[in-house]
Structure formats: structure tokens, C-alpha cells
């Protein structure tokens, strides 16, 4: 019995475009890639992006790779090139309180659905970065390390990362002292030290253990003082 999609599709390839090309040759295009940014942060939004690239070389995207391997400058330079050259792209965001209400995994999966639904081109196949996503409008495949294995996922990774980083830089102006523009809401020593001094702001995720523990200590201290 022949597996479907073809086995070549699910192997991690040496070239970023091999996965998309194999799917398109099998009649399953256009192919959308989906990825997120901010899943592990204790502050700021969860941002999810979807992107469809045509199965052809893009000289302007020659540096495209897993966004975590790229410098901030390179990501910023790639962002307008991706939005200009992509067949379709979409970015959705969940603020901290919504991540708390839904749970980060549920928000991530729902974000992937919404990002794909927001594409102006309906994909024939969807590649997600590591997560199985039920309820998509097309067949899909989770790819471990997908942002390093498929160009459309790498492009979505850059879109999500740059979009979120820009929000965090603006948030640094609204909530000074935490260093959001530097650490982007992740649990760095500097961020944790600022949290101890300033306490959580409205952009911190109350469901995160370190934020919840700090709030618990503050509540106990307030209770003891009364």
C-alpha cells in the first residue's frame, strides 16, 4: 500500500524547498507553511503566521532559514521581501490574557487555524512546525524542525517573529523598566530581576508559573500587612 503523502515529503531534506516541490509535483499545491513566535515567553502575545510561496527560486529570500538562526537585522530585511513575494500570507495574534484564558497550546493550535483561514489563497496542503493541527481546510503534516526544513515554514517563522518583536519593542515604551525591547518577554535573568522589583504588568501571562508565584507572594505579603 502506497503511503500518502509520498515518503519523500515527510523526510527532512537538505534543501529548504524540497518538501514544497514534492507536494506540488504530487498535485497538492499550493503549500502553506505555519509557525508561531512567543510560545515560551512569560509576557506579550503569541503570534502565529502562515505563508504560501511559489515553488521557484527567490534570490531575495536566499538567506531564508529558521528565524532563530537569523540575526534581527536579517529577519527585518527578509520581512518586506516575504510579504512582497509571497503568494499569500497571514499573521494573527493572541494577547497575554487570551493566552491565559485558552492555554498556550490551545491558543497555538487555534492560531494556526486562523492564520491558514486568513490566507487569500486556499492551500492544497499545509505544513506545520511540529504540531498536528486538526480542523484545517486542507490536508496537513507536522514537521519537526519545520522552519529549517521547508521554505514556507521558515517564511512564516520570520513573519511571526518580526511581527511579535515589533509589538514587544512598542510595549517597552508603554511598560518601561522590564526591558521588553531586549528580551522580548522571555525568561532571561534581567527580565526575572525586573519582575521581582516591579511586579507583573498587564502584559505578563498570569498562568506562567514564575508570574503566578510572584503574584502569590505579593498577595501573601499584602495579607500579612493587613
Swiss-Prot record:
InterPro entries: RNase_HII, RNase_HII/HIII, RNase_HII/HIII_dom, RNaseH-like_sf, RNaseH_sf. GO terms for cellular component: cytoplasm; ribonuclease H2 complex. Pfam families: RNase_HII. Manganese or magnesium. Binds 1 divalent metal ion per monomer in the absence of substrate. May bind a second metal ion after substrate binding. One of its GO terms (biological process) is DNA replication, removal of RNA primer. It comes from the Bacteria. Residues 29-220 form the RNase H type-2 domain. GO terms for molecular function: manganese ion binding; RNA binding; RNA-DNA hybrid ribonuclease activity. Belongs to the RNase HII family. This is Ribonuclease HII. It comes from Rhodococcus opacus (strain B4). NCBIfam families: PRK00015.1-3, PRK00015.2-2, PRK00015.2-4. It is found in: Cytoplasm. Gene3D superfamilies: Ribonuclease H-like superfamily/Ribonuclease H (3.30.420.10).
Amino acid at each position: 500500500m502506497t503511503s500518502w503523502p509520498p515518503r519523500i515529503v515527510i523526510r527532512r531534506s537538505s534543501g529548504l524547498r524540497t518538501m514544497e516541490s514534492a507536494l506540488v509535483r504530487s498535485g497538492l499545491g499550493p503549500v502553506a507553511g505555519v509557525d508561531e513566535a512567543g510560545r515560551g515567553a512569560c509576557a506579550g502575545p503569541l503570534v502565529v503566521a502562515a505563508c504560501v510561496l511559489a515553488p521557484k527560486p527567490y534570490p531575495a529570500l536566499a538567506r531564508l532559514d529558521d528565524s532563530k538562526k537569523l540575526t534581527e537585522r536579517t529577519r527585518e530585511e527578509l520581512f518586506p521581501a516575504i510579504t512582497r513575494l509571497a503568494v499569500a500570507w497571514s499573521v494573527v495574534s493572541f494577547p497575554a490574557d487570551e493566552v491565559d484564558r485558552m492555554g498556550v497550546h490551545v491558543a497555538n493550535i487555534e492560531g494556526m487555524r486562523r492564520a491558514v483561514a486568513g490566507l487569500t489563497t486556499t492551500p492544497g496542503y499545509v505544513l506545520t512546525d511540529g504540531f498536528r493541527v486538526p480542523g484545517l481546510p486542507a490536508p496537513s503534516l507536522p514537521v519537526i524542525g519545520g522552519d529549517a526544513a521547508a521554505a514556507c515554514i521558515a517564511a512564516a517563522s520570520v513573519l511571526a517573529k518580526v511581527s511579535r518583536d515589533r509589538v514587544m519593542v512598542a510595549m517597552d515604551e508603554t511598560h518601561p523598566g522590564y526591558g521588553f525591547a531586549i528580551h522580548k518577554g522571555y525568561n532571561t535573568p534581567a527580565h526575572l530581576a525586573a519582575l521581582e522589583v516591579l511586579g507583573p504588568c498587564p502584559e505578563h501571562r498570569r498562568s506562567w508559573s514564575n508570574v503566578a508565584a510572584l503574584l502569590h507572594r505579593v498577595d501573601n505579603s499584602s495579607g500579612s500587612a493587613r
